[in-house]
Amino acid sequence: MKIKQELLQACIDYANKRIFNYKTEIETIKESIESNDKAGDDDDDSGNGKLFNDLEKNSQHLGDANKMLEILKNISPNSVSDKVIVGSAVKTTTNNFFISVSAGKIDIEDGSYFAISHLSPIGMLLMGKSQGDAIEFNGNKFTIKEVI
């Protein structure tokens, strides 16, 4: 269970960092928009247009990061299953995976894991599989050694 707790915490830290960064960027953009408005430069709206686009993009990314955090909050590191489910740590003959959210490579004491969404192509292949099952991804075959 320690493995899953470490992986889950790393993913939560990743999501919280993204949320913090997007909130900071949104505040910076809002300040720039206010600054432009106070300058009274009515002739040039292109600067604000770009800022509004950036604001919208960052707001969408913030929403995605918040959804990511909600998914993580619903994962119990103490759950046990013989089959791959959301929250499983999966060791294979080639790579190790943590089925959660797409958060990239995570290095913990037990080794390196890739945090992937269950909706990702490889996540969908792994879901429901058990120890000893083999899957093929991008022309590479590998076998599940352990589901934690």
Question: What does each of the following model-derived ranges do?
Answer:
Residues 1-75:
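N-terminal intrinsically disordered, low-complexity, charge/repeat-rich segments that act as generic
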Residues 78-136, 142:
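Non-DNA-binding regulatory cores of transcription-related proteins
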Residues 144-148:
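Conserved hydrophobic positions within beta-strands
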